Amino acid sequence: MDHRDFLTRFLDASCEAMDAFAADEAARETLIRMGEDVCTSIRNGGKLLIAGNGGSAADAQHIAAEFVSRLMYDRAPLPALALTTDSSALTAIGNDYGYEHVFERQVTGLGQKGDVFLGISTSGRSPNVIRALHAAREKGIITFGFTGVAGNAMTELCDRLLLAPSPQTAIIQQIHITAAHMLCAVVERTLFPVEGR
């Protein structure tokens, strides 16, 4: 089997979506506003909570790691927590209440007013992410969403929403992690400014 044509088409679709994202002024403004919200939260003693499923769960952990460790240069750790990492909590909640509650209960138990919650769902329809967004709003937590489909259930639940311009899950995920790096960079540059960076 010759994979060359498929790989060329995949790369073309990836580049096309990334070009569309790069040209989207509104997306950049959204990321800047998200960064400002995260900075305000952290300055006031808050934190960033992040959740998603599958590849988006890995993205949640990746994002939290960039905040707690570093992205572009050495600086103090920033408070971020992926709600996808505690296997005991995930399996207890999933077993006792149902998988759709695994993030909702963590947001309710760990989140505080003024925190930020980022829900990641390529489809915008993940029940556990939707429930977590509802729980966050009830607690006065600022709600962000990364998704790939306009007009989905996350639209009404997110204070700030970033849409990846592709119908393909893998390419949506590529844009999400790029956006996450941009978000972290905005926060890092704001809270720990370094001349020339």
From Swiss-Prot:
Can you list the GO cellular component terms from the UniProt entry?
Answer: cytoplasm
- PROSITE patterns noted in UniProt: SIS
* Residues annotated for Zn(2+) binding in this entry: H62, E66, Q173, H181
- Name the major location: cytoplasm
| Binding residue positions for substrate | N53, G54, G55, E66, N95, D96, S121, T122, S123, S126, Q173
GO molecular-function terms, A-Z: carbohydrate derivative binding; D-sedoheptulose 7-phosphate isomerase activity; zinc ion binding
| Cofactor (UniProt) | Zn(2+)
Question: Which keywords does this chain's UniProt record carry?
Answer: Carbohydrate metabolism, Cytoplasm, Isomerase, Metal-binding, Zinc
Cofactor stoichiometry and binding? Answer: Binds 1 zinc ion per subunit.
UniProt catalytic activity: 2 D-sedoheptulose 7-phosphate = D-glycero-alpha-D-manno-heptose 7-phosphate + D-glycero-beta-D-manno-heptose 7-phosphate
Task: Write down the EC number.
Answer: 5.3.1.28
Which InterPro entries would you find in this protein's record?
GmhA/DiaA, Phosphoheptose_Isoase, SIS_dom, SIS_dom_sf, SIS_GmhA/DiaA_subfam
Where does this polypeptide localize? Cytoplasm
Q: What class of enzyme is it?
A: isomerase
UniProt pathway annotation: Carbohydrate biosynthesis; D-glycero-D-manno-heptose 7-phosphate biosynthesis; D-glycero-alpha-D-manno-heptose 7-phosphate and D-glycero-beta-D-manno-heptose 7-phosphate from sedoheptulose 7-phosphate: step 1/1
What region holds the SIS domain? 38-197
GO biological process per UniProt: carbohydrate metabolic process; D-glycero-D-manno-heptose 7-phosphate biosynthetic process
Subunit composition? Homotetramer.
Other comments on record: The reaction produces a racemic mixture of D-glycero-alpha-D-manno-heptose 7-phosphate and D-glycero-beta-D-manno-heptose 7-phosphate.
Q: Which family, according to UniProt?
A: Belongs to the SIS family. GmhA subfamily.
Q: What role does this protein play?
A: Catalyzes the isomerization of sedoheptulose 7-phosphate in D-glycero-D-manno-heptose 7-phosphate.
Q: What is this protein called?
A: Phosphoheptose isomerase
* Organism of derivation: Granulibacter bethesdensis (strain ATCC BAA-1260 / CGDNIH1)
